[in-house]
Amino acid sequence: ELKSDQWKHRKLSQSWVKYLSFSLEKYHREKNENIYAFPSKLDLKEKLGIKQSEFLFDISVGLYKSFKSKKFESSKKVLPIYYQSKPIWQIESELAENTREIAIDFSKLLAGNADYAMMVSPEGKEKRDYYMDEMKKMLESNVSLGRKILYFLILPHPRDWVNKKREWSLHNWDNNDWKKVKKGEWIIKEK
């Protein structure tokens, strides 16, 4: 069965989000085994009783703690109940070139409480400049980011990922404007 281009792009984007989440989880778990990511490579349903694959953000990495359930609940056993005690990363990825969704996702990041937040959006010079200018306006009207370190990652649209060399760029908010901190290229070879 042939799949639409839109379906393929969505699957590529979802795979990329999972890869980034798994990489962040691996990096942080080397420092503390109580750090988990959503989505996770680990079986969190079996390990922690957590069934969802997303926790408020496309990617959420945080420190988890637990408390004991009470016997008066429906469960016959006293089980630990896990909760995120300290968010570390909150990431939103909107590669569908939908300005409304990018603004909604960026607003979620501004409302979040992680030390690190990142918005991922599609490239294209005009689009990139437009998105960054509009997000800058949102930041200028925001009272305070506190200690939050905010990144903006510009990636090619998934339609341009396979068999094409493409550039990406990472920008950091310096309380005044977006500053490019890193750039690179990638190419995904079709099998």
Regions found by a protein language model. Give the residues of each.
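Active-site-adjacent loop/helix micro-motif of nuclease/hydrolase catalytic cores
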Residues: K70-F72, A96-K108, K125-Y131
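Polar low-complexity intrinsically disordered regions
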Residues: L12, S53, S66, K76-L79, ...
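Short, surface-exposed basic-aromatic patches at helix termini and helix-loop junctions that form
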Residues: S107-A114, K136-E140
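Short, well-structured alpha-helical interface segments that form or flank functional binding sites
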Residues: Y19, E54, K86, R100-K108, ...
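Domain-level recognition of nuclease-like catalytic cores that cleave nucleotide substrates
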Residues: K125-E190
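Conserved catalytic cores of phosphodiester-cleaving nucleases, focusing on short active-site segments
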Residues: I59, S85-L95
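Short hydrophobic alpha-helical runs that function as membrane-insertion/retention elements
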Residues: Y116-P122
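Acidic-basic catalytic patches of nuclease active cores, encompassing PD-(D/E)XK
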Residues: E1-S69
